[in-house]
Amino acid sequence: MKTLAVVDSSGWLEYFTGSSRAQFFAQAIEETENLVVPIITIYEVFKKVHRERGESAALQVASSMQGGTVVDLDLSIALDAARLQLPLADSIIYTTAPRHGAVLWTQDDHFKGLPSVRYFPIPSTSP
């Protein structure tokens, strides 16, 4: 049995823009039978794509994200997420992953060192 995956919003954005970092998230995103998608992730990605590329592109992205199992925010996740010292969306995304037996794939420093996280650090760009 494969491990389930939750991909953080930044990973989805790397994937959809085809950046050089998309490779880190492609496997988790493309194996939709093992993909858990917190609804707040769709919100964050839709909002950014809508702002930068318009309604049509944002709707296509949101549709694509629904290939995995979309998970709504419930009271239990909300309360557990509120106990974390993370920003709102990050705490909900992080709490959703273990709740569904998934590993969180991310490049966000907020999650570095936390259990059940597959962290892909962004190389520093020193002058």
Residue ranges and their predicted role:
Residues 1-37, 49-62, 125-127:
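Short, well-structured N-terminal submotif of metal-dependent ribonuclease cores
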Residues 2, 67-68, 94, 98-127:
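Acidic, PIN/NYN-like endoribonuclease modules and their adjacent C-terminal/linker elements
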Residues 7-8, 37-38, 86-90, 108, ...:
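Histidine- and aromatic-rich ligand-binding microenvironments
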Residues 10, 76, 91-95:
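Active-site phosphate/pyrophosphate-handling residues
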Residues 12-13, 42, 78, 111-112:
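A generic structural signal for short hydrophobic patches within well-formed alpha-helices
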Residues 41-44, 64-84:
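Acidic catalytic patch
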